[in-house]
Design a protein with these regions (language model features):
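Short, thiol/selenol-centered motifs that function as redox-active sites or metal-ligating centers
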Residues: 110-113
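Extended, subdomain-level signal for the structured scaffold at the beginning of enzyme domains
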Residues: 1-103, 115-123
Length: 123
């Protein structure tokens, strides 16, 4: 991976994201110099699932209603079962995703993450 210094990545997730599908990519992005912000449907913290059990929490940097695509260079959509079910029906989340596609910015989706792309009608 080339250096991501000076790049800012949005990670859009909600309660029930699969722990490894958020934590591992975030760690990799940060290790390459990227700034990563967690965007969610609510402020505070969101809770991970590890398999079928609730697990770690992560702090939310901004709500999706506050976040703007123009502040980011790329978007990551982690999977999990509960997470995409919430994100894909949120109107602000759908708009946020569509805005990345309208500007031809990179979007990565893991596991069940592409469900949001389907609801946003970008794939």
């Amino acid at each position: 991976m080339s250096s991501l210094k000076d790049k800012k990545i949005a990670v859009l997730a909600a309660d029930g994201y699969e722990q490894s599908e958020l934590e591992s990519p975030v760690e990799a992005l940060k290790s390459e110099g990227a700034t990563v912000e967690i965007i969610s449907l609510k402020s505070g913290e969101i809770k991970a699932m590890k398999g079928h059990e609730w697990s770690n929490s992560v702090a939310v940097d901004k709500t999706v209603s506050e976040a703007k695509e123009s502040d980011y260079d790329a978007l990551l959509l982690p999977g999990g079962v509960l997470n995409p079910d919430a994100v894909r029906v949120d109107k602000d989340a759908i708009k946020f995703v569509k805005d990345f596609f309208s500007k031809n910015k990179p979007v990565a989706a893991i596991c069940h993450g592409p469900q949001t792309l389907i609801n946003a009608e970008v794939v």
